[in-house]
Regions:
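Adenine nucleotide-associated cytosolic modules
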Residues: 1-269
């Protein structure tokens, strides 16, 4: 266990005051290892809140550089960061918030060749991506490696999320396979309200913190959806499918798959 310094006790004092956290819980967070895939709309609030919370080891994967159109929702980046790799921009802000955090960057695309190698050292994975192929890749790699992860998806005014633990419903239990390329509009085509990314990203961050603290009920075996226009939140119960291609009784997928690109992630209704 880590012995907190006086400065750390002050920094995390509002956590430590919580009966469900305390010194022991904060020490758990300082030992935690979280990988964030995507340093964009969802990854931004997740990275900021996990760093502020004192999650001791955070990895972040993204091959892109900061673009002007990102700044409407990707709040970890600033105008001065234009053209900078997103992972480096994110690392700078995370360390500025909390120098206790160790940040590992992967300036690369996640694909079938590197996904398991990148994910393997981490305890919890945040899916902050904006395309179906990588979402299925993250799911399949995490299931194969026995890793917990939080799925998140946003489009227009809507968001959805769930959490997977080994033995609970996975992404393929909800959605069997990616839609055909081009069947779902991209965020650049359909748009997204910037604040939606913050709403969903902070939920994902809370799920990660709850996981390490062992507090409350995680969003397992249920999909949380919301519509910011109406502010209606609902949860849909989904059972693990015995016939699931990756986590079922007789899995048929025995390797990772690079699907054809089909960006954004909410089903088009």
């Amino acid at each position: 266990m880590i012995d907190l310094t006086e400065e750390q006790i002050e920094r995390y004092s509002r956590h430590i005051l919580l009966q469900d956290v305390g010194l022991e819980g904060q020490e758990k967070l300082l030992n935690a290892k979280v990988l964030i895939v995507g340093a964009g709309g969802l990854g931004s609030p997740v990275a900021l809140y996990l760093a502020a919370a004192g999650v001791g080891h955070i990895g972040i994967v993204d091959a892109d550089v900061v673009d002007l159109s990102n700044l409407q929702r990707q709040v970890i980046h600033q105008t001065k960061d234009l053209g900078t790799p997103k992972v480096e921009s994110a690392k700078e802000k995370m360390l500025a918030i909390n120098p206790d955090v160790e940040v590992t960057t992967y300036h690369d695309f996640l694909d079938s060749h590197n996904a398991e190698e990148i994910i393997k050292p981490w305890d919890f994975v945040i899916d902050g991506t904006d395309n179906f192929p990588v979402k299925f890749l993250i799911n399949d790699a995490c299931v194969r490696l026995g890793k917990a992860f939080s799925h998140g998806g946003i489009l227009r005014f809507q968001g959805q999320t769930f959490t997977h633990l080994p033995g609970t419903a996975c992404y393929r239990c909800f959605f069997k396979e990616p839609p055909p390329a081009g069947a779902v509009p991209t965020c650049s085509q359909a748009g997204v309200l910037g604040a939606i990314a913050g709403m969903l990203g902070t939920i994902q961050a809370a799920e990660a913190l709850k996981y390490f603290l062992g507090v409350g009920d995680l969003l397992t075996d249920r999909l949380l959806t919301f519509d910011a226009k109406t502010m209606n939140f609902r949860t849909i119960k989904v059972k693990k499918r015995a016939s699931c291609e990756i986590c079922g009784d007789h899995p048929t997928i025995d390797h990772l798959i690079d699907y054809e690109q089909a960006a954004c992630d909410l089903k088009h209704h």
